[in-house]
């Protein structure tokens, strides 16, 4: 006796693309067939496709299972995750890594020797226990459900840009303080972090350097989150000044023009926890920096601080001018303390990698992508990106926004951050500066970046140039598409089904049980939808599911007589006439040219 098939649940149906299958199959390098891999990925992304007792952990185990053994290669999983952009020290993977090390320690004690990571093997229960705490990010990564789906290709393109810019020999290292003058002009680093925590680094990314004026962006974001934009902008404006970044001038309302010029940045720092003592204020900002950086390296260079303070005549002149015009909050009693705090924050040390995470937090609406912790409120995050776009590159801000079209902030140490909103943050570091105080290699890299990818703020993503590519884009033939065809068929939503057909969706697709949308429509008895699928979409009427049942069998089983008669006619057509429309059901309804009753015998809810 043939078992009764289960009815498709009302959920979105996700299928892996051929590109995803090929990419993962190559990475995993297993003996698993592409069809088995496809079914496994379906099971990971579509819970209703799995057996009741199977979880995502079981499906992932099957991906990395060693043939003929109840073991899987956890080392292979880690290798694949790295290729997809995730690092072993990613905070979201830390629970998994700790459990792996615990099991590996036990194994080493038994055999009295260390095992290379790539050879790590775990039993099914151990494997599942390891990945369970990090299952969300592991599942997303294996489905390439990330903002940059084809990570390996993207990283190769970035590496090419990095190497091209490495040959640039223009610019001079800043010399106004000894600590900057001693920097090697050959230092060159690029690090990026996406809003999903995918990361890549090139060059001297571990070399520490001071943030200098890059701190202005984060100081504004911190104080605006703490006090609110209205309070902050009662002291500082938002307009580009059109003047030198350290010029002694105010706007028409006697306020600094914006938080990115020196005068505005000094006032901004004076607003940070202005009622507390200096030590607590510094601790507060440093802790905020660490949160924004996902607890990656944040340090302090005291020598740079002392040198900045010793060469501060211009900033003192600015501060006294602002004090005369009552620009500071009333809590600011000592200009020396106010400037010391400003210089301290300019002397905070980072690496290219930690600053890239900070930039990606701004790209991610103020949420750190590797810890999922909200560090900056959404509106201040939006506002700081607007200010960086219009005022972030010293006296070249207008030129940079025109040519590159992305929010950015630079500093005289050679540091530079660039934000692609909702995509990634990039940190560039190269000490040689141009005549306007921006990193020569950094600016050149950004120009090459937007000439390669559709990242410029005003690049059209629809009618785009063939010269540029959009690494975010999932081509209709390649992307992992969320196809609601089974949901639509189950609901009898004919207008939506027609729209999906017009958009090029494959209405012949089948689920894990090889059931098609025609099977579902026949089960429900949706006459007009069946006629549309047969007469217009030309779906396969003979296709059998895993139980060997056709759509006609479904219609007969559920006693939908009119549908049965129509499908019988459709199946009796010779192969050469399969593209012809089948005559109407045996009803008195008038039929239009598309095979739809002009007055349907029932209403689709």
Swiss-Prot record:
Biological process (GO) annotations held by this record are: glutamate biosynthetic process; glutamine catabolic process
Q: Which InterPro entries does its entry note?
A: Ankyrin_rpt, Ankyrin_rpt-contain_sf, Beta-lactam/transpept-like, Glutaminase, Glutaminase_EF-hand
Give the residue spans that cross the bilayer.
none
Family under the similarity heading: Belongs to the glutaminase family.
Is Repeat tagged as a keyword? Answer: yes
Keywords, A to Z, come to: ANK repeat, Hydrolase, Repeat
MF terms per GO, please? glutaminase activity
What organism is listed for this UniProt entry?
A: Caenorhabditis elegans
Ranges for the region named Disordered are 569-605
Q: Could you say which EC number(s) this protein's record lists?
A: 3.5.1.2
Q: Where is the composition biased (Acidic residues)?
A: 586-595
Q: Which reaction does it catalyse?
A: L-glutamine + H2O = L-glutamate + NH4(+)
Q: Which residues bind substrate?
A: 213, 262, 308, 315, 342, 394, 412
Biased-composition ranges, Basic and acidic residues, are 569-581
Q: Where are the ANK repeats?
A: 480-509, 513-543
Pull one GO CC term from this UniProt entry.
Answer: mitochondrion
User: HAMAP family recorded for this chain?
Assistant: Glutaminase
Pfam families assigned to the protein according to its UniProt record, in alphabetical order: Ank_2 (PF12796), EF-hand_14 (PF17959), Glutaminase (PF04960)
Protein name as annotated: Putative glutaminase 2
């Amino acid at each position: 006796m043939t078992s009764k098939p289960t009815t498709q649940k009302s959920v979105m149906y996700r299928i892996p693309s051929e590109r995803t299958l090929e990419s993962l199959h190559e990475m995993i390098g297993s003996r698993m067939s592409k069809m088995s891999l496809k079914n496994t990925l379906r099971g990971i992304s579509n819970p209703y496709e799995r057996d009741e007792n199977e979880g995502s952990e079981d499906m992932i185990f099957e991906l990395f299972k060693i043939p003929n053994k109840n073991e899987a290669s956890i080392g292979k999983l880690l290798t694949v995750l790295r290729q997809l952009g995730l690092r072993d020290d990613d905070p979201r993977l830390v629970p998994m890594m700790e459990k792996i090390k615990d099991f590996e320690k036990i194994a080493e004690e038994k055999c009295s020797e260390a095992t290379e990571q790539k050879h790590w093997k775990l039993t099914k229960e151990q494997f599942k226990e390891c990945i369970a705490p990090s299952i969300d990010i592991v599942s997303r990564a294996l489905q390439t459900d990330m903002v940059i789906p084809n990570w390996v290709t993207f990283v190769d393109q970035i590496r090419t840009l990095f190497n091209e810019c490495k040959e640039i020999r223009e610019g001079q290292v800043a010399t106004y303080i000894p600590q900057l003058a001693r920097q090697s002009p050959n230092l060159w680093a690029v690090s990026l972090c996406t809003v999903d925590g995918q990361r890549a680094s090139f060059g001297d990314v571990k070399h520490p350097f001071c943030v200098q004026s890059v701190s202005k962006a984060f100081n504004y974001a911190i104080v605006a989150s703490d006090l609110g934009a209205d309070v902050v902008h009662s002291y500082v404006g938002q307009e580009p000044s059109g003047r030198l970044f350290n010029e002694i001038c105010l706007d028409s309302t006697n306020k600094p023009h914006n938080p990115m010029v020196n005068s505005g940045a000094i006032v901004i720092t004076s607003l940070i926890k202005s009622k507390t003592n200096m030590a607590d204020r510094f601790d507060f900002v440093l802790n905020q920096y660490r949160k924004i950086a996902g607890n990656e390296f944040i340090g302090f260079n005291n020598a740079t601080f002392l040198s900045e303070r010793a060469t501060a005549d211009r900033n003192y002149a600015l501060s006294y001018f602002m004090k005369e015009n009552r620009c500071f909050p009333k809590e600011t009693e000592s200009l020396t303390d106010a400037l010391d705090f400003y210089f301290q924050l300019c002397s905070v040390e980072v690496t290219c990698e930690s600053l890239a995470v900070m930039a990606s937090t701004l790209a991610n609406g103020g949420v750190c992508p590797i810890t999922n912790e909200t560090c900056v409120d959404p509106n201040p995050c939006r506002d700081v990106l607007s200010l960086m776009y219009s005022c972030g590159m010293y006296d070249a801000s207008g030129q940079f926004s025109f040519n590159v079209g992305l929010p950015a902030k630079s500093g005289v140490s050679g540091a530079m951050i660039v934000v692609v909103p909702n995509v990634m943050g990039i940190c560039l570091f190269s000490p040689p500066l141009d005549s306007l105080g921006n990193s020569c290699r950094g600016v050149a890299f950004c120009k090459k970046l937007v000439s390669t990818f559709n990242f410029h703020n005003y690049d059209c993503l629809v009618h785009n140039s063939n010269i540029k590519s959009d690494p975010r884009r999932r081509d209709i033939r390649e992307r992992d598409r969320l196809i609601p065809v089974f949901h639509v068929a189950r609901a009898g939503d004919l207008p939506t089904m027609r729209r999906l057909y017009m958009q090029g969706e494959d209405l012949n697709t089948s689920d894990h049980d090889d059931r098609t949308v025609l099977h579902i429509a026949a089960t429900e008895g949706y006459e007009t939808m069946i006629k549309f699928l047969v007469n217009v979409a030309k779906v396969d009427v003979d296709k059998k599911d895993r139980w060997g049942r056709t759509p006609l069998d479904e219609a007969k089983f559920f006693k939908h007589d009119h549908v049965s008669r129509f499908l019988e006619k459709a199946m009796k057509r010779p192969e050469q006439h399969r593209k012809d429309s089948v005559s109407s059901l045996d009803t008195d309804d008038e039929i239009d040219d598309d095979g739809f009753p002009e007055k349907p015998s029932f209403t689709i809810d």
